[in-house]
Amino acid sequence: MRSGRFIGVMSGTSLDGIDVVLATITENMVAQQASLTWPIPHAIKEEILAICQGQSLTLSQLGRLDTRLGRLFADAVLALMRQESLKPTDVIAIGCHGQTVWHEPQGEAPHTLQIGDNNQIAAHTGITVVGDFRRRDMALGGQGAPLVPAFHHALLAHPVERRMVLNIGGIANVSLLAPGQPVRGYDTGPGNMLLDAWIWRQKGKPYDKDAQWASEGKVLLPLLQDMLSDPWFALPAPKSTGREYFNYGWLEQHMARYPGLRGEDVQATLAELTAVTISEQVLLSGGCERLLVCGGGARNPLLMARLAALLPGTEVSTTDEAGISGDDMEALAFAWLAWRTLAGLPGNLPSVTGASEASVLGAIFPANPPQNRS
């Protein structure tokens, strides 16, 4: 079982940047050493958003975007390597999630698509890449998501305390870590995605810093109840979703019944939607003693306050307080999953995804030996 330095690369549904993290990984340890966030150019972000909202495109357009994203991921890795004065031979492998542009786990032919050509990353960095993590789980009847609960369990499970780890990215998901019980985890619905989409359309800002705009508004109960009536929220766990479902078009459909709404009131209502749907799922799962929050939503004081209010008796804190960077959690998880793949160890948890069995995940894109690279 190889131990050493791994790099994790994550570009999530929030599209707020490419997270790259360097960690030393052994059988008993994941030690983060460095990280950075690499910007996603506006034009590429707009193309990704268009695909996720169902706009048509040619195979040529998709292929070009796949290549450009692969090169962008490689640039992000190379920036971290320069920052840390690393050579390709200093890193065992890169675990790259890719950019999800479609995720459809239901139906007669469930499928998911992450783009960002891993061949480009391997060729331009000179480091072996492990990618395409989700489709093996789907081939075994699973949802293909979430995959990070296995990592949460490895690092944050407690021998006696009933914990949940909540990641509030574009989509929010929870991992239940209860002593003596199988790990469970699933998506709860929108995290930051609709909040970010609304403020981007209304104010041209990528996100609502410190929930300043939402805090100026009031929750619109009719709109909130209308959104909560969406049948997805009533689906049993395990379940997963993404931008292809909860997008700006979804928000517009619900808002169309309520003309003349103030922008800040909509923002406040979207924050409440995120908090309510998370808290309901936490309670349906039996609750927890400690809720550890990571992702961009952990820096949203309104969301954190509402979660604490909706979950009395639960200590709501961040994973940073438990020693794991909330901003880098998912990138770290995919570095760890790459380590497991190369070690021949399963990366999914059937109790989380619904797969018929645990399996080694991903495909390996080997780097050329140093003597073969110019």
Curated annotation (Swiss-Prot):
The keyword ATP-binding applies. Gene3D superfamilies: 3.30.420.40. Pathway: Amino-sugar metabolism; 1,6-anhydro-N-acetylmuramate degradation; Cell wall biogenesis; peptidoglycan recycling. It catalyses: 1,6-anhydro-N-acetyl-beta-muramate + ATP + H2O = N-acetyl-D-muramate 6-phosphate + ADP + H(+). One of its GO terms (biological process) is peptidoglycan turnover. HAMAP family: AnhMurNAc_kinase. This is Anhydro-N-acetylmuramic acid kinase. It comes from Klebsiella pneumoniae subsp. pneumoniae (strain ATCC 700721 / MGH 78578). The lineage of its organism: Bacteria, Pseudomonadati, Pseudomonadota, Gammaproteobacteria, Enterobacterales.
